[in-house]
Amino acid sequence: MVKEPNGVTRTMRRIRRIHFVGIGGAGMCGIAEVLLNLGYEVSGSDLKASAVTERLEKFGAQIFIGHQAENADGADVLVVSSAINRANPEVASALERRIPVVPRAEMLAELMRYRHGIAVAGTHGKTTTTSLIASVFAAGGLDPTFVIGGRLNAAGTNAQLGASRYLVAEADESDASFLHLQPMVAVVTNIDADHMATYGGDFNKLKKTFVEFLHNLPFYGLAVMCVDDPVVREILPQIARPTVTYGLSEDADVRAINIRQEGMRTWFTVLRPEREPLDVSVNMPGLHNVLNSLATIVIATDEGISDEAIVQGLSGFQGVGRRFQVYGELQVEGGSVMLVDDYGHHPREVAAVIKAIRGGWPERRLVMVYQPHRYTRTRDLYEDFVQVLGEANVLLLMEVYPAGEEPIPGADSRQLCHSIRQRGQLDPIYFERDADLAPLVKPLLRAGDILLCQGAGDVGGLAPQLIRNPLFAGKGGKGA
């Protein structure tokens, strides 16, 4: 039987079974899990089994490995990610039988329709900000439903059905699908040149789409915008909705001062209109995470969450999988090396993480293992990648993760190595296979180093492999 939290109208009355094509994806599995918890029958297919599909199976989802037309038999609706096209046999079969096929964001919008939706948009910082909001709301006793693009460490999942009317979710601009959402509160963390193929290579079109997204808010809704970002500041006058700004800038409505970082923990003071200054700390390094915390504080304050709960929720935040996740210590001659895994795959994200490391551990060397994500992104942001990757002390580059793209001449990791080497910043090392990394990197490591594995592709599997590798006799740690 389908059930809804108190005060939430039941939706999708004619729908019983929901089939997800590409159910293992970060944006898909969370929605599937919430629907399972609501009592819907859920099935889904993916190209390979994973911890995600196994988890959904334990919760009652029927999982198919591979895409076959018959997988969708009995479904009342198909949910597809932007990576799935009409030629997919399950989609083609559903269309032939006049079964509705909807994008992932439309299903998320349906979940949000009768809830108090809080949607977090922006090129960078969506997952962490969404996670922080969910954590602070939970600390305030509001028990939100959340759908996040990464695993919330405290909950062990990237989605959860709460008992309240609140739903907190990421709003994805990569395919402009966030335009389906009609939240009560919307955050814009920043706007950067990424996923430009969606916008025909036109940055102005991207900016206009963010403006359109914010105007999906009702006239009594709230836009929460980071004025430290120049593009967000630029579109601010176009937003005809109630707005609160945040940042480090002196003209921000809510701002952070007295910022101090030691290792993983960051302390700062929050200034809010008509409120006493609030001293907070968060167990994450970097100014970018101060900004993510400020967005959370704006929304929590607006929803009436107590300062005590805000401080508790931020201080006790246990992080998100692959967002500066500390795996533990690798044993090397003379001591150990801190092993960190991170999802950052845009030059601005890479720069923010490097800055956080330099700020929290100024005496340590940074040994970086990086995998570019998509040939098009590598091509479009090539000079930015050359500049930022050259800031490591030691750099190992894995081949580009294609994400379904064909190689582009001159936009690969070998060429990046060549360009960085030519500038005399350092001498990068190129490698192709996961198994090559441990013997390559071990002689390069010194006691006290930080080893950062970063990128959005299969580089995400390297840190778990290294911490178990007998070459290092590693002692595992908890994700940060």
Curated annotation (Swiss-Prot):
Q: What class of enzyme is it?
A: ligase
Q: Where are the transmembrane segments?
A: none
Under catalytic activity, the entry for this protein gives: UDP-N-acetyl-alpha-D-muramate + L-alanine + ATP = UDP-N-acetyl-alpha-D-muramoyl-L-alanine + ADP + phosphate + H(+)
Identify one Pfam family in the record: Mur_ligase_C
What the entry lists under SUPFAM superfamilies is as follows: MurCD N-terminal domain (SSF51984), MurD-like peptide ligases, catalytic domain (SSF53623), MurD-like peptide ligases, peptide-binding domain (SSF53244)
InterPro entries tied to this protein:
Mur-like_cat_sf (IPR036565), Mur_ligase_C (IPR004101), Mur_ligase_C_dom_sf (IPR036615), Mur_ligase_cen (IPR013221), Mur_ligase_N (IPR000713), MurCDEF_pg_biosynth (IPR050061), UDP-N-AcMur_Ala_ligase_MurC (IPR005758)
Query: What does the entry list as the binding residues for ATP?
Result: G122, T123, H124, G125, K126, T127, T128
- Enzyme Commission number(s) of this protein: 6.3.2.8
Q: Where in the cell is it found?
A: Cytoplasm
Citing just one GO molecular function, the answer is:
UDP-N-acetylmuramate-L-alanine ligase activity
According to UniProt, this protein's pathway is: Cell wall biogenesis; peptidoglycan biosynthesis
GO biological process entries: cell division; cell wall organization; peptidoglycan biosynthetic process; regulation of cell shape
Cellular component per GO, a single term? cytoplasm
UniProt cross-references to Gene3D superfamilies, sorted A to Z: Mur ligase, C-terminal domain (3.90.190.20), Mur-like, catalytic domain (3.40.1190.10), NAD(P)-binding Rossmann-like Domain (3.40.50.720)
Q: Which UniProt keywords apply?
A: ATP-binding, Cell cycle, Cell division, Cell shape, Cell wall biogenesis/degradation, Cytoplasm, Ligase, Nucleotide-binding, Peptidoglycan synthesis
Report the leader peptide range.
none
> What is the stated purpose of this protein?
Cell wall formation.
Under the heading PANTHER family, the entry gives: UDP-N-ACETYLMURAMATE--L-ALANINE LIGASE (PTHR43445:SF3), UDP-N-ACETYLMURAMATE--L-ALANINE LIGASE-RELATED (PTHR43445)
Similarity comment: family membership: Belongs to the MurCDEF family.
Know the name of this protein? UDP-N-acetylmuramate--L-alanine ligase
Per the UniProt entry, what species is this protein from, by scientific name?
Pseudomonas paraeruginosa (strain DSM 24068 / PA7)
